[in-house]
Amino acid sequence: MSQTITSLDPNCVIVFNKTSSANEKSLNVEFKRLNIHSIIEPGHDLQTSYAFIRIHQDNAKPLFSFLQNLDFIESIIPYHDTELSDDLHKLISISKSKILEAPKQYELYNLSNLTNNPKQSLYFAFLQNYIKWLIPFSFFGLSIRFLSNFTYEFNSTYSLFAILWTLSFTAFWLYKYEPFWSDRLSKYSSFSTIEFLQDKQKAQKKASSVIMLKKCCFIPVALLFGAILLSFQLYCFALEIFIKQIYNGPMISILSFLPTILICTFTPVLTVIYNKYFVEPMTKWENHSSVVNAKKSKEAKNFVIIFLSSYVPLLITLFLYLPMGHLLTAEIRTKVFNAFSILARLPTHDSDFIIDTKRYEDQFFYFIVINQLIQFSMENFVPSLVSIAQQKINGPNPNFVKAESEIGKAQLSSSDMKIWSKVKSYQTDPWGATFDLDANFKKLLLQFGYLVMFSTIWPLAPFICLIVNLIVYQVDLRKAVLYSKPEYFPFPIYDKPSSVSNTQKLTVGLWNSVLVMFSILGCVITATLTYMYQSCNIPGVGAHTSIHTNKAWYLANPINHSWINIVLYAVFIEHVSVAIFFLFSSILKSSHDDVANGIVPKHVVNVQNPPKQEVFEKIPSPEFNSNNEKELVQRKGSANEKLHQELGEKQPASSANGYEAHAATHANNDPSSLSSASSPSLSSSSSSSKTGVVKAVDNDTAGSAGKKPLATESTEKRNSLVKVPTVGSYGVAGATLPETIPTSKNYYLRFDEDGKSIRDAKSSAESSNATNNNTLGTESKLLPDGDAVDALSRKIDQIPKIAVTGGENNENTQAKDDAATKTPLIKDANIKPVVNAAVNDNQSKVSVATEQTKKTEVSTKNGPSRSISTKETKDSARPSNNNTTTTTTTDATQPHHHHHHHRHRDAGVKNVTNNSKTTESSSSSSAAKEKPKHKKGLLHKLKKKL
């Protein structure tokens, strides 16, 4: 049976032109060469086909290098496979019940971790931060509107708060929150399929200075079109005032819409001409190195049109209409109308001109409430409604109908058809297009501009924007994740930066400059409006004055300040705002200067990135791993010190389960090495220095057993956190919780067949291995891997020599030694050698050193050596029935070598006679003379004989 799309579980779909059969053939050849499974089905129309494939990081790079040279590739879709799709749906479903709650930081981190789209995640991070900052602004506006004893319009307290809020928000975003997210979202090289296809024909890279000079040449063009738009806006404003307040002829209700129709028609037409004949040719002449830079240049050039069309109507009303409306008296109107014969023939009012005092309120309410509702509907509902209406009016698209009939012949299953329909929606549906980040940033910043410039008119505006943004966040999140065409693969493809790889510092770019400009301009406009209208002579505006009782108030100047004072006040506010902004910026910058310029300290290391597609319940910081390592190391050190105080002796370092604890133990002894012991890089260095010995000793045994060597296994298993050994691993007694709670069901886990304690034997073996490994690791940790074996030979005289004697050294014992070298290692942790230590003479030291050298050479060839932990009693040795003692000689010149006294007892053996104890002690003593690797094999045989 042929493979289905569902069983393939594709994570990539290639949309290509199938007009030529050679196109599909060339793709199949490349898929076969790279061993990529593929299924090719008809596309959404008769000219396209879909190639469903599943790729991974290894074969993705050569595949895209091949696709970049093909002209028939229309799009590459990083399709979400089953696992990723389930994770994203879970992430979205969590936020369904939190529509009116501010999004959490870890949710954004999980989003970036799953999609590997840092730019999109940064947009949601900006929106999240903006929402959180709107909360206090909204509550303050509500309190001013409903609880203040003064008028809420042009309130000085609200204006001061708005200015400080604006500067604080901008500074915190630029110097705290954006770097915060940039450090966490730009860890991986993101591969944009959109930029990949658009950058096929790469332009020759030009110097940035040349591009900047070419951009400056566009300034006169932008100023010209700005002047044209501003002039037309003033004309429409004058026409509106004339029709609504001066004209007294027929069709006033219909003609009143004429200015709005004119401005709504003229602005798009001017924008099309501006872009088609000036912006695009000039951008092409600038010759940018990538499509992204060219798009940014176009956005910057269009910003002039956007700013004028958005804010000029309110600026005209507040700075022209209200202050100067009183000048339009009957005499002036007569002179103006007589100058134009056409106007003189029109019927007009004979009464004096009275300004509309609520005009600015209506305009601001329209931009804050009605305009945002219209934009939200145009983005989310109108396209779908228009598509449905077109299908009912014109019928279904014939190309789509033929394509669906062709795909019907393929007889796809329901699950396969669901995947095919999803890919089709990416190509045809209104929501299927790639999520436009620039358009959404522009929408948010325009809203921000209205708030910081004109919210002193209506303090409820921040609360309205907060509600709107909470809804927009949920809708945009679903649109971007579930419906829009993905742009990035969830795994890195290009390791090095390229034109299609995003490894630079993550930033919103142009919109940061717009944010700063709006902040400074908003502070100036808010303060100036408050200065002008807080105590003006317009009824119902600002504070009430005595002139409000005068019926001829419209004939007097409504502003109590001269224009010179207003301009000087605006300049003063601008300087103060810039100074406060730079003050906030310098404070935030200084708080993030963790490492000074110059040489980076050795203990500052790069923390490994968390694995991709991992879900977190809180946002991890860059210092997350290293801080936890230090905490664990310090916690381990405090536990050791407590044990030392109780026992009056120091405990040896332990090593278990392939994890090294030597670095942590060394960190406890040397406080300056805490960070070094906890850093992953030095942990890896420590393991690599040990690898040389492990390779020479352990690889043969590990290879014969079909398992990974200890060094490889420990390297793979080691994570960034230090493993803290339990107290039981030190083999000391105390009021501690045992590793296995003793019950009747787990008796076989605690005792062997003969009733001997497994825990005591394991603790003795681990303690003994840790002692020798700690000594060897300390001496050779600075040596490379290849010199570890030679270093062991050179340092053999400096390693503490262990001499184990039991009774007479007769010929039978020597024969057993020879036989032990040929006996394979039997890993039986149930046998615990009982060894007591005492000081021997110098002659014993020499003989033992020679014997130990031979044993080390043999163990290096045959496998890992297992040393026996040695103890030295203070006054007397442990009593035994056969008075057998074990002599241990230790090199006094070795630094940091501690002698430990342990009392061993077998918990599982209670009915053992004196003869059996004597035999066991004798067997253990004679077996201890065997080479360290094979001692347990011989002990196991002796145990069976006994």
From Swiss-Prot:
Question: Keyword set for this entry?
Answer: Cell membrane, Membrane, Phosphoprotein, Transmembrane, Transmembrane helix
- Positions in the Cytoplasmic compartment: 1-121, 175-217, 275-302, 469-505, 585-946
Where is the PTM Phosphoserine found along the chain? Answer: 638, 704, 720, 729, 757, 793, 844, 847
- Name-wise, this protein is Increased sodium tolerance protein 2
Ranges of the Extracellular topological domain: 143-153, 239-253, 324-447, 527-563
Where is the PTM Phosphothreonine found along the chain?
701, 726, 850
Gene it is expressed from: IST2
According to the record, the residues making up region (Disordered) are: 617-638, 665-718, 759-784, 846-946
Output compositional bias ranges, type Basic residues: 895-905, 931-946
- Which PANTHER family does UniProt cross-reference here? ANOCTAMIN
How does the record say this protein sits in the membrane? Answer: Multi-pass membrane protein
- Tell me where in this chain the PTM Phosphotyrosine is found: 730
Function of this protein? May be involved in ion homeostasis together with BTN1 or BTN2.
